[in-house]
């Protein structure tokens, strides 16, 4: 009408503020570890990808060529940052990733390893609940490193050397490369999960601003060779 108008505004950004790269101070084997806990308000989206090609020569028999001989896991984790300092630290970490370029270690945040007995300060063998690792364990990327989160907030990272049969059918033993230097009961661990070498699976990450100091982010990640 003569008193109501509707318009669509498009803004050009004349200049952007440079974001300083900020790498994680937690490292394992000289590679940063991303230990920020995800926002588990919904299930993690996960799918398995393989570098496979179907070879069909028209003779009636087809073959599959799996280049990597292993699956690559793609997961999408949600994160919630609740203040400006957390947001600034995340944006600095994101800049250090350079999209898909720079890899990092990331806990799977899955309860894959459940201890059942106390481990002593000098021991390198942990008794865990049976998950079939002794039977099906294969030293492949994503199953050779583990992350241990103690109830005091300290992270420990270890290389898994082997799995073996336990004293009962409900247990297995997991050998790690280094002892913890302290006694630990099963309830002393907040989380124990596999540690995967990972990279972002996108070059651009959308940051969803809820307010001027609260943002939500969904990070697609893809496992890589360690």
How would you name each of these model-derived features?
Residues 1-226:
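Extracellular/virion structural assembly segments
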